[in-house]
Amino acid sequence: MKKKGGRKIFGFMVKEEKEENWGSVEFQVFSFTNKIRRLASHLELHKKDFSSERGLRRLLGKRQRLLAYLAKKNRVRYKKLISQLDIRER
């Protein structure tokens, strides 16, 4: 992972970011994954922050729906993405 502007950026996404491919499913899943990881680390420190916990659950659901869509449309891209982001397969 590389640091860019205070945020962690995976090397494979930097190229896509320069191409302004923000609407792609892969980039959206990447964004949700970064937000999820940031919220998870916040919740480790603030265990009673229930509104953030609810937000985390919503983000997890959104990411899961996008991953289900990608798995249905293009299984190869789905497999590549989950291996690059190091997330579990559903």
UniProtKB/Swiss-Prot annotation:
GO terms for molecular function: structural constituent of ribosome. Keywords: Chloroplast, Plastid, Ribonucleoprotein, Ribosomal protein. It comes from Oryza sativa subsp. indica (Rice). Belongs to the universal ribosomal protein uS15 family. Pfam families: Ribosomal_S15. This is Small ribosomal subunit protein uS15c. Transmembrane segments: none annotated. Part of the 30S ribosomal subunit. The gene is rps15-A. It is found in: Plastid, Chloroplast. HAMAP family: Ribosomal_uS15_B (MF_01343_B). One of its GO terms (biological process) is translation. PANTHER family: RIBOSOMAL PROTEIN S15, BACTERIAL AND ORGANELLAR, SMALL RIBOSOMAL SUBUNIT PROTEIN US15M.
